[in-house]
Amino acid sequence: MTVSEGIARIQAFRKQVPLVEKNENITFFNLSFQPPMNSIVANTINEYVDWGLYNPNPKPLWQQKAEETRELVAKYLNASSSDSIAFTRDTTEGLNLFQRSMHFQPGDNVVLLDGEHPNHGFGWISLQEAGLEVRLIPSKDIYYADASTFEPYVDEKTKAIGISSVMFHSGQLNNVKDICNKFRPENIHVLVDMTQQVGLSSIDVQELNVSACAFACHKGLSCPTGLGVLYVAPDVLPQLKNVPPIVGAGAIENLDANLLVNLNPIYFSTARRFEHLNKSLITTLCLNNYLSFLMDIGFENIEQYLRELGKSLVDELSKLGVTIIGSKDPKKRSTHSYVAKILNPEWDAFLKNEGVYASQYRDGIRLSLGLYNNAADISRLANTIKKGVLNKIPFN
């Protein structure tokens, strides 16, 4: 698909998001929390319901579709095999499955930014009881992390580094590849939370050289909540504990055909050992259809569209005296997430009252773009902020 064709399809996508297409009074900048429903996903849910209503045995069809989705996710991530992909319930479960599969001794340590997402950070912190030391890097003024960020905190007892590819509160794009290439040869695993990046840019887990990554599918991938993905690099799996942290029938390779329990289970040697037998099949269908839509457009077109829209956002806000935190270098910033340095809590209520939906965090108001956003949304946001200024609401 050419660039012009891809951009045209993105622009047409707004018509498939009724919340923004049919409501002139709503301007939505909150994809990083959860995007509004689109007709691709809604139609998939309706299709699932129809199968359940009128098919006497739909589950095998759904299970087969889930396997097709696994293949599609592997293709998107450029995983060497779909066996490296496990479906989970969310990011938290995926991260914890890896964290609790690692070998470590009391006194070993893991290093992460203190601004890491709580779903990631507290997974490591829960292992303190078993003797793991958690080292937190102060990150108040850090808006980009690479290997040099972690190096002063890493020593011979470091077993892992935890990092988000895109930080939820700032939109910064960390240099995951640099971190992995520096520390993985030192037998330090790098676990990456990619929830704020998937569906919004291309990802190559082999090029990034991650030990493992986990993400939820309800943000950039537009699915209902309840489905996540865990990728584990094939060379890393043999280094993990033999028994997964959560075990059900889905983890067992030698499962008896009559479903009898035996005392000598053989766990899958692949990432499938981390799966439940029953997963959110309805959400795997949604993921299949929406990810297919994105891949058909092409992520190079998606990235270009979002970055151009983001540049317009930054330019318009700068005219109003509003700065965006972090680097202006696109190599250090996500495609879609911009945090305006507006700290006064009055703005959150004011924006919502004006129909502008965003999220306020410790560094300011996060304005996160989706494919349904357009230049008119940027203009409406700017006009709303002008109105707030006229109402004498200070930025800070």
Curated annotation (Swiss-Prot):
Keywords: Aminotransferase, Cytoplasm, Nucleus, Pyridoxal phosphate, Transferase. This is Uncharacterized aminotransferase C777.03c. InterPro entries: Aminotrans_V_dom, PyrdxlP-dep_Trfase, PyrdxlP-dep_Trfase_major, PyrdxlP-dep_Trfase_small. Gene3D superfamilies: Aspartate Aminotransferase, domain 1, Type I PLP-dependent aspartate aminotransferase-like (Major domain). The modification N6-(pyridoxal phosphate)lysine is found at K219. The keyword Nucleus applies. Its EC number is 2.6.-.-. Transmembrane segments: none annotated. Belongs to the class-V pyridoxal-phosphate-dependent aminotransferase family. It is an enzyme of class 2 (transferase). Its cofactor is pyridoxal 5'-phosphate. One of its GO terms (molecular function) is cysteine desulfurase activity. It holds the Pfam family Aminotran_5. It comes from Schizosaccharomyces pombe (strain 972 / ATCC 24843). SUPFAM superfamilies: PLP-dependent transferases. It is found in: Cytoplasm; Nucleus. Its main location: cytoplasm. Disulfide bonds: none annotated. PANTHER family: CYSTEINE DESULFURASE (PTHR43586), CYSTEINE DESULFURASE 1, CHLOROPLASTIC (PTHR43586:SF8). GO terms for cellular component: cytosol; nucleus. Coiled coil: none annotated.
